[in-house]
């Protein structure tokens, strides 16, 4: 698949609320996933499919998604970006927050080799 095809499919899946399948389908075995700030007690850098999946499972378990929108993708060479806008409730505190995030994906050999997440300041 081309970078554009991967990008389009990832966005289409996320727009349905499916944030798990894109990783299963497109992460390289040695994917590197970098958060702007790591989850509490966790490293902001996850290395490998299992670590990236564990981070996603933690996030899904810690938040309730009230609404989400996904924009993009925007493709440039072997990379693309996607904008995620989410209204979530933190399960532990009950606090509601709006998150605006840009994800930058780098593709190598038809797989996501790296993903970086950027948050609004």
Describe the residue ranges of each PLM region.
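A solvent-exposed, acidic/Ser-Thr-rich amphipathic alpha-helical stretch
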Residues: 20, 24-73, 77
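Short beta-strand edge/turn micro-motifs at domain boundaries
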Residues: 100-121
